[in-house]
Amino acid sequence: MSESLRIIFAGTPDFAARHLDALLSSGHNVVGVFTQPDRPAGRGKKLMPSPVKVLAEEKALPVFQPVSLRPQENQQLVADLQADVMVVVAYGLILPKAVLEMPRLGCINVHGSLLPRWRGAAPIQRSLWAGDAETGVTIMQMDVGLDTGDMLYKLSCPITAEDTSGTLYDKLAELGPQGLITTLKQLADGTAKPEVQDETLVTYAEKLSKEEARIDWSLSAAQLERCIRAFNPWPMSWLEIEGQPVKVWKASVIDTATNAAPGTILEANKQGIQVATGDGILNLLSLQPAGKKAMSAQDLLNSRREWFVPGNRLV
């Protein structure tokens, strides 16, 4: 068996917690866990711990929640743990150069794309949005840049026509721990083969916004259908009707040309709500008016047919 490593884990959401769980079953020694401070959540704005903190406390691991790792005293928390390696998964804080250099084997990161494609904050969503045929995870050696470090290990998976960001997130949350455990074994054995990223292939996965998720009917039906899957479950594609936001959960592309202006309602029936776009027709299948649950287009038409009169335009 490979050497058992002393590991600091740094992460915050459920995606990170799944990696911590795998580490705890791997035979390595997790000596400390860093996660973001508790945040207000829910209607009562009660302070809630991160999924990583919940798991770490269940396992009686030391938990640290600094607001920043820039202050010297917070960097000392890392140094005192005398780790071989620091594993970073969706932590949300910048690691200064001094911290990156503290562990014997440095810091490694699990990133939700096949680098150098989709560096940045929203790689899962952007891969769907762009119509990529595949994605995956990259385990990389961290440096001071944004996802610029040498690649240590990659695992890929296909993107299907049904995938949403939610389903892709789950797939990568399965792949990531596999890649992480393999990489740690290679680091412990001295067999890791770092690969420099090709800067000519870099793309950036910019952070999502609710405004970006508003449906722009001038785009093609194919692009809009991908957006709807990419922005599900957050921030959710939406349109506005009579001043109310209506979320769109599912749609399909009807590959028929139309001369109607983008946003024009062409048909509204049990097959869906067909709307002209910049190229082709988008068929809305599942929608969610404000304050309601998601429902089929047919159910929405039963209660709000006046919203979808053929010939009218959605803006």
From Swiss-Prot:
Catalytic activity: L-methionyl-tRNA(fMet) + (6R)-10-formyltetrahydrofolate = N-formyl-L-methionyl-tRNA(fMet) + (6S)-5,6,7,8-tetrahydrofolate + H(+)
Keyword Transit peptide on entry: no
Signal sequence, renumbered to the chain: none
Cystine pairings recorded for this chain: none
A GO molecular function held by the record: methionyl-tRNA formyltransferase activity
GO CC terms, sorted: cytosol
Transferase found in the keyword field: yes
Superkingdom of this protein's organism: Bacteria
Family named by the database record: Belongs to the Fmt family.
NCBIfam families, A to Z: fmt (TIGR00460)
Biological function: Attaches a formyl group to the free amino group of methionyl-tRNA(fMet). The formyl group appears to play a dual role in the initiator identity of N-formylmethionyl-tRNA by promoting its recognition by IF2 and preventing the misappropriation of this tRNA by the elongation apparatus.
Protein name per its UniProtKB record: Methionyl-tRNA formyltransferase
Gene name linked to the record: fmt
